[in-house]
Amino acid sequence: MQSRLILIVEDNDDARDALRMLLELDGHVVEAAAEGNEALEIARGKDPDVALVDIGLPGIDGYEVARRIRAADGKRPLLIALTGYGQPEDRRRAAEAGFDSVLVKPVDPNALSDLLATLEIPARGFRG
């Protein structure tokens, strides 16, 4: 699997650290944020290939983070929603906000690896 720059947006320290460790073991470069505004700053500055975004963030929720990333100029990262529920309504709202996929927490490491391996992730553009 190709190494990607992945942004994790998760307010739970343990969940964020576990995801970071899993992704780094798979050879990815990871940036992490605990809340929405921090995530948006990182997304603007680092231009990640993928963003794993918890829906239930304090302050700006994950849906709004996704909408703002989608509205920004530049590359369109693959957006994966992380939710504790996964009900049809959650999936519908995630799609409307601009997410490409939804994973239910706790995230199954194999499901995440499989998702990253099979989904089309846009190639990084020219960065002159």
Describe the residue ranges of each PLM region.
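Short amphipathic alpha-helix used as the core "switch/output" element in two-component signaling
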Residues: 41, 63-76, 116
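Two-component/phosphorelay signaling modules centered on CheY-like receiver
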Residues: 13-31
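Active-site beta3 strand of CheY-like receiver
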Residues: 46-52, 57
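The feature encodes the CheY-like receiver
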Residues: 58, 87
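C-terminal output helix
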Residues: 107-116
